[in-house]
């Protein structure tokens, strides 16, 4: 399969703003893709070489090295390439322009004076993989040579998207939900097959692998997909409510209440002596927790198991729970040993998805919890999360206050009914979180995605200091604007914002974004921030839930304030419009009750 086909479709996708048209065009591309490389077509469309959970590096080629490779491949001086980059602002466009005007290649090609070797998808993928995996002495020069060789063979459009892929800026506006829609069209005959594909993806978070299974064996093959040790399951997500009575009613009048720890949610896989730890974003973070690996080996009786829990930083003197930020020291590669000593952790396990050949995701929570307690040998480090069975509102309220006093964020109330399965990748009312924020009228913070930014004035003049934030609707694969946030940033965080936005800047709005506001720059949806504010309110400027509460207005946050970056969350895990609507309706209900009481 020629890489040119992908480049041509990417060029067409970039010009489209309708999700329906995006899905139709991607469907067409997948129909034309050879089944032996369809997994690679999916990965490239996702902007990656392999799933995040693979223990493999990213490409790791900076702008300067790409410019050097482009210079080698075109015989054009680096200074001239840098000049063109300042003019065009997109190295992919620079590559396209230079390849078109590079007469030494194009004249011969068009006159047929030389045989033109066409790039294949396999060749491009293998070359980029080689670049990513190269390390050690001489790897820098090898990467430049490999990329230069690839660009030399590429035509202008291919070069544009090879550079953009490496740069992390494909700009085709395709999310995982759209890919699943297209796969359903190609291999399942339409939307009826979509739930099957999504369930397979939730249990095996590798769309490339799923596409290959579909291409080789058809839709029936994915019906039998089960959890597999070493391949992460997409995490189940909780809804949020603020009224304990409503929460208990939602879960059927009784449930389990778990502490909500302020730590790193972790999915832990064990197979014999091998242990893998994955983040909620499904990234392999085993390297950060070698101590946890040993704890799990010594605490879990099962041979093959997939568990879920929270890794929490602990004060080494008092044993008290420390804030999540203390775990950031674990991300540094060079001093893990020191971080283990200074920032010890506890592991609080709260769910079981797979155990010695048996899929537990379809079992109700009481069965999962019973088996979890059976296979865990609890000690000072590895424990089953603090929890309580409740069937009265006052029990929930008392346990909530106990959780807060013990240094947690609050509680999660979980259904224990027959339908209380582990809903991988889904957000629903089987789990409901109840959190307390002491600094705001909003009952809870929200996690929103940056989709645009505005330049500041006065002291912040010339800097992008106000961020356009959006909620994510997974059913529509669409981001809806909620607020502009400009407060809460330290000077250091504001400098970090400049770097982040320069790397994510787009020439035009991402097709998945619905906005009636025109920011100074559009941003690729990739960064999630935790935001708090005074209250959820109506706004004619924002698109979140527009037409739901009011025909003229959407929902927004009054006096929004930045709290922290949520690096542990993907954009698809951001707060949904439905959650914001629930928060708005709960606030209205409370106001009515307050008025009635007076």
Swiss-Prot record:
Active site per UniProt: 260
Annotated residues for binding of ATP: 258, 265, 280, 310, 350, 427, 433
Catalytic activity: ATP + (deoxyribonucleotide)n-3'-hydroxyl + 5'-phospho-(deoxyribonucleotide)m = (deoxyribonucleotide)n+m + AMP + diphosphate
Keyword Cell division: yes
EC number: 6.5.1.1
Pfam (any one): DNA_ligase_A_C
Cofactor: Mg(2+)
GO molecular function, one term: metal ion binding
Assigned keywords, A-Z: ATP-binding, Cell cycle, Cell division, DNA damage, DNA recombination, DNA repair, DNA replication, Ligase, Magnesium, Metal-binding, Nucleotide-binding
Family statement: Belongs to the ATP-dependent DNA ligase family.
Matches recorded under HAMAP family: DNA_ligase (MF_00407)
Function, as annotated: DNA ligase that seals nicks in double-stranded DNA during DNA replication, DNA recombination and DNA repair.
Record's protein name: DNA ligase
Organism: Sulfolobus acidocaldarius (strain ATCC 33909 / DSM 639 / JCM 8929 / NBRC 15157 / NCIMB 11770)
